[in-house]
Design a protein with these regions (language model features):
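N-terminal active-site segment of His-dependent metallophosphoesterases
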Residues: 1-67, 75, 169, 357-366, ...
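Conserved beta-strand segments of alpha/beta enzyme cores
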Residues: 2, 77, 104, 122, ...
Length: 371
């Protein structure tokens, strides 16, 4: 079995007001081209097909056309799950008959325990889930974090393992290294915050993950993030984007890079130097610019946009350093809950839910009481 592992398409996403739909259409052609050239048996999309739970009409049309092209025209089996940015009910509309065309779209926990069998491989499609959903499914209030939830889920999936097949998990969550020791009190494991241990995922021959946009977020030969296929923020400017080509027998994983349609560049310099060097820069790419000038420059953003039309952020070095110093000082004095919420937001791009906040406060209070 040979398949492509991709994730986090975020169709409909914008970059500081700039639509990325045209770039996403062009990038899709690269993905399709690789699938054809490598003669893959299937294409796996590990969640976050859309950027919003309520995508606009253009985003829906673009994704529908992409999936129809891969599945109906090119005849590739497609295996996909809903991510935290997707609306499972909306995404699952039509899923009952999609499978008759070898388009397997899983949006419910219950369906994750029925593997899709293609060739020598069983694919277990596990959509993004909340802790409470798993507690309710197993009627087990002792499930208090994501790793415990996954331990129950994996144990249930193993009941369906066919001994003569390879076993692939497709999922959308935060995975990290080995489990911490039981006496560690520095690790705050909050519902939805704690990572899934790689040890929990050991029964699978390969784990195709989505959620984190950097393929280097986890270094494991058989448990991998594909990362997003394109750069969606300035923080991803230096990341290489692409997807994994996976062979299950003999097992082999190969990284397939994708070329940015319009790249994101980080530029730093004086106004004069930026204007002088503009001719050497691609006009249609995106730019994050840090100005080193100390004096005031009237209408600087519009003047720079005459040379760099797609400026997504503009900073002044003197102010940027001041902001960094203030942020460091604030962080040093911040309460543990504030640090936790900031970390979660920076890591996942989402805010803590009311339930997560409540559990976080309770856990922190318990830790404080042990001191």
């Amino acid at each position: 079995m040979r398949f492509l592992h991709t994730a986090d398409w975020h169709i409909g996403k914008t970059l500081n007001g700039f639509s990325l739909l045209d770039d996403q259409r062009e990038l899709f052609k690269q993905i399709e081209g690789v699938a054809k050239a490598e003669q893959v048996d299937a294409i796996v999309i590990a969640g976050d097909l859309y950027d919003s739970s309520i995508p606009n009409e253009s985003a829906v049309r673009v994704l529908n056309n992409m999936l129809k092209q891969l599945n109906l025209t090119d005849k590739f089996p497609v295996l996909a799950i809903s991510g935290n940015h997707d609306s499972a009910p909306r995404l699952s509309t039509g899923a009952d008959w999609f499978s008759f065309q070898n388009f397997f779209l899983q949006t419910s926990l219950e369906g994750a325990f029925n593997p899709v069998v293609l060739g020598n491989t069983q694919f277990f499609l596990l959509p993004f889930f909340g802790i409470q959903t798993v507690r309710n499914y197993f009627n087990d209030p002792k499930i208090k974090n994501v790793d415990l939830a996954m331990q129950r889920i994996v144990a249930e999936m193993k009941k369906a393992f066919a001994p003569d097949k390879k076993h692939v998990l497709v999922a959308h969550f935060f995975a990290a290294g080995s489990k911490k020791t039981a006496d560690s009190e520095t690790l705050i494991e909050v519902g939805g915050l704690s990572p899934v241990s790689t040890e929990t995922l050991a029964p699978f021959d390969y784990v195709a993950l989505g959620h984190l946009h950097n393929k280097n977020a986890l270094h494991d030969g058989r448990i991998k993030y594909s990362g997003s296929p394109m750069k969606f923020s300035v923080s991803e400017a230096k990341q290489e984007k692409g997807m994994w080509l996976v062979d299950t027998e003999p097992f082999q994983v190969k990284w397939i890079p994708l070329k940015p349609v319009h790249d994101i560049h980080l530029l730093k310099g004086s106004f004069a130097d930026l204007v002088k060097d503009a001719a050497q820069q691609p006009t249609d790419d995106f730019y994050d610019i840090e100005l080193t000038d100390k004096g005031r420059i009237p209408d600087v953003l519009n003047r720079l946009r005459a040379y760099y039309p797609k400026i997504v952020a503009l900073h002044r070095t003197v102010f940027a350093q001041m902001i960094r110093n203030q942020a460091n000082a604030k962080r040093a004095q911040a309460a543990p809950l504030d640090l936790l919420t900031d970390f979660y937001s920076e890591t996942t791009g989402d805010q803590l839910s009311p339930t997560q906040l409540r559990v976080a406060k309770s856990t922190l209070s318990e830790i404080e009481g042990r001191k």
